[in-house]
Amino acid sequence: MSHLQYTAKSHLRNFKTRIFRDEQADISFNSAKQMWFYGFKLHMLVSLSGYVVNDLVTPASTHDSKACEELLEDTNFPMILADLGYISQSLKQRLAQKGYQLWTPLRQNMSEAKHHNNWKLMAKRRTIETRFSVLCTEFDIQRPLVRSLCGLELWLESIIWVYNLRFFN
């Protein structure tokens, strides 16, 4: 079982908007923080133990469900716990054809939310959310100090590599 997660990447200042203008960065709304941001999104596939299995950087306006299938390439996790951003019936059907079972919690105002949102699965998601916040607090991944998309990807890969070293004693 693994978890699919994303974070909004960087609230770029005015001088950085010029740097990333040719690099696919764009604007999007982060509904969790109720704010607009300019930059990229980092999507990650994380095991239940917190090990980062795969990651993908997309422009900020890319819908989460579009990144999902690319993240799952070359993985063998049959059960995927995902964020609310990955709610899509068509995505669920496409992944089912490939042998994946996608579970996303329902929003509280959706019908059947109380029956669908299993507390055990929600607890597993919470554990992984905690691991994800470690990347934000210890490595400050939401404020990259890079000057290109290639630099951003290299910077993230090095952080994820160092983070994953914790799982090997």
Predicted segments — roles?
Residues 1-107:
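Polybasic low-complexity intrinsically disordered regions
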Residues 51, 163-169:
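Short helix-capping/linker segments at secondary-structure and domain boundaries
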Residues 65-68, 132, 158:
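A general structural signal for well-ordered alpha-helical segments in protein cores
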Residues 44, 129, 161:
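A residue-level signal for conserved active-site and pocket-lining positions in enzyme catalytic cores
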